[in-house]
């Protein structure tokens, strides 16, 4: 009958175990292996701390069998690996989950803001014709409105009419805006240029006006 002496860590009294009667012919006695819960409960403080990744010496440094000393590094590695996985999971749950929730909230809020801006644009839709010349409104404010609406479009200005044409070749939308004779001076003062021969859009449309000067505000579009 074989007797096995082993210590869970240096400095603790060895534990003596005796194998069962049918184990006399076993060359290497099988030591008692505690469960993981027992090992962690009996381990030094670094093992019991679930927030630390610093580990003490192996739980099973050696097993004595007479004059033979055998190493159980593989078992030590297995226990350390399990413990490291548990600590890693706890750290992920403690740190990464709140960070993920915060990031998800920021992305959701950004998506909501973008959706609101897309549904309620500042400029009026190009698919409808609308009169921007109510009675009593000055010419300066009307031209300011033209400059705000003309994003990514070419604008043609005559002394009597302003038309906004989309630069998309497939669709040309016209917003009729009445402009009086001071449009000429307004555009010249701001260096936006004049033309009397017509201006060609990206869609291939040429527009000429006989008897009236034609002005383009494409520089602000």
Swiss-Prot record:
Signal peptide: none annotated. A motif (PPXY motif) lies at residues 44-47. One of its GO terms (cellular component) is membrane. Residues 1-22 are annotated as: Disordered. The keyword Membrane applies. It is a single-pass membrane protein. The chain crosses the membrane at residues 100-120. It is found in: Host Golgi apparatus membrane. The keyword Transmembrane helix applies. Keywords: Host Golgi apparatus, Host membrane, Membrane, Transmembrane, Transmembrane helix. Belongs to the varicellovirus ORF0 protein family. The vaccine strains V-Oka, VariVax, and VarilRix harbor a mutation in the stop codon that extends the ORF by 92 aminoacids. Late-budding domains (L domains) are short sequence motifs essential for viral particle budding. They recruit proteins of the host ESCRT machinery (Endosomal Sorting Complex Required for Transport) or ESCRT-associated proteins. Contains one L domain: a PPXY motif which is involved in the interaction with ITCH, a member of the NEDD4 family. Interacts with host ITCH; this interaction probably mediates ITCH degradation. This is Membrane protein 0. It comes from Varicella-zoster virus (strain Oka vaccine) (HHV-3). The lineage of its organism: Viruses, Duplodnaviria, Heunggongvirae, Peploviricota, Herviviricetes.
């Amino acid at each position: 009958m074989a007797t096995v002496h082993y210590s869970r860590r240096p400095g603790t009294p060895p534990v003596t175990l005796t194998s069962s009667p049918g184990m006399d012919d076993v060359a290497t006695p099988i030591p008692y292996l505690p469960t993981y819960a027992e090992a962690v409960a009996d381990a030094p403080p670094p093992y019991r701390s679930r927030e630390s990744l610093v580990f003490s010496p192996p739980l099973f440094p050696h097993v004595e069998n007479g004059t033979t000393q055998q190493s159980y590094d593989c078992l030590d590695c297995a226990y350390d690996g399990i413990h490291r996985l548990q600590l890693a999971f706890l750290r992920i749950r403690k740190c990464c989950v709140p960070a993920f929730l915060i990031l998800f909230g920021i992305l959701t809020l950004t998506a909501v803001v973008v959706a609101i801006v897309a549904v309620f644009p500042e400029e009026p839709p190009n698919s409808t014709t609308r009169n921007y010349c109510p009675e009593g409104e000055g010419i300066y404010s009307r031209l300011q409105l033209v400059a705000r609406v003309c994003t990514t479009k070419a604008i043609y200005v005559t002394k009597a009419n302003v038309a906004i044409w989309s630069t998309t070749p497939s669709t040309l939308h016209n917003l009729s805006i009445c402009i009086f004779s001071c449009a000429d001076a307004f555009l010249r003062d701001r260096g936006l240029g004049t033309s009397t021969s017509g201006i060609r859009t990206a869609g291939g449309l040429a527009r000429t006006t006989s008897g009236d000067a034609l002005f383009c505000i494409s520089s602000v579009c």
